[in-house]
Amino acid sequence: MADEKNKPENPDLDQRDINNPRDREALKQAADDFLKARRAEAAADEAEGEVDETANRIAVLEADNTELKDQMLRVAAEMENLRKRTQRDVQDARAYAITNFARDMLSVSDNLRRALDAIPADALEADSNLKSLSEGVEMTERAMLLALERHGVKKLEPEGQKFDPNFHQAMFEVPNPDLPNNTVVQVVQAGYAIGDRVLRPAMVGVSKGGPKVSAENGASTSEDNA
């Protein structure tokens, strides 16, 4: 009895008697609790690892998605640029397809005009057949130029305009103090454009000795003060 009185009410597991059924049950329960705790910790660690792995996969997928979006946007932009470039090339091909042909036809027109100008006026008055022939050639010239105009070929009318090397070719200078310097005063050979391109520059004579036009404000200054 003295031994039982000396036993503590809640003895430690190390002090349990394995041969005592009650102690053996307590030890078993403690072992089960320990295993459950370890399993719970392992499950929590595994779940945390799965969460981290899932988060990493999501981050990778988001990065891939962003890259694919960027690639798709770049492809779309390239396709749009290609579409515009193709459309522009088609428009240019349509507009300028007859460039070489038109240039050759202008040479023919020039020859017709030279032939007409070479016929003396008195010869036309004296010979009705020659006059009829001349009128036929002139009608042919006009019809040719009208046909070219319908296909986008336009005649340049530079007389009285300021000389522009992009559209005009200066052949000579004419002293004229009354006109601003470099004003087109005479057209030797007509120029032509097709679309926004020069098909053939106009050959012109320009004034010299007149007031210059200021590039800043458009005001005229005298040749001596320039």
Curated annotation (Swiss-Prot):
Organism superkingdom: Bacteria
InterPro entries in UniProt: GrpE (IPR000740), GrpE_coiled_coil (IPR013805), GrpE_head (IPR009012)
Cysteines joined through disulfide linkages: none
Principal localisation: cytoplasm
Sample GO molecular function, one term: protein-folding chaperone binding
Spans traversing the lipid bilayer: none
UniProt feature coiled coil, ranges: none
Keywords: Chaperone, Cytoplasm, Stress response
Polar residues bias: start-end ranges: 217-226
Pfam families linked to this entry: GrpE
Gene Ontology CC: cytoplasm
Location relative to the cell: Cytoplasm
Function comment: Participates actively in the response to hyperosmotic and heat shock by preventing the aggregation of stress-denatured proteins, in association with DnaK and GrpE. It is the nucleotide exchange factor for DnaK and may function as a thermosensor. Unfolded proteins bind initially to DnaJ; upon interaction with the DnaJ-bound protein, DnaK hydrolyzes its bound ATP, resulting in the formation of a stable complex. GrpE releases ADP from DnaK; ATP binding to DnaK triggers the release of the substrate protein, thus completing the reaction cycle.
Subunit structure as annotated in this protein's UniProt entry: Homodimer.
Family per record: Belongs to the GrpE family.
PANTHER family recorded: GRPE PROTEIN, GRPE PROTEIN HOMOLOG, MITOCHONDRIAL
Name of protein: Protein GrpE
Taxonomic lineage from the root: Bacteria, Pseudomonadati, Pseudomonadota, Alphaproteobacteria, Hyphomicrobiales
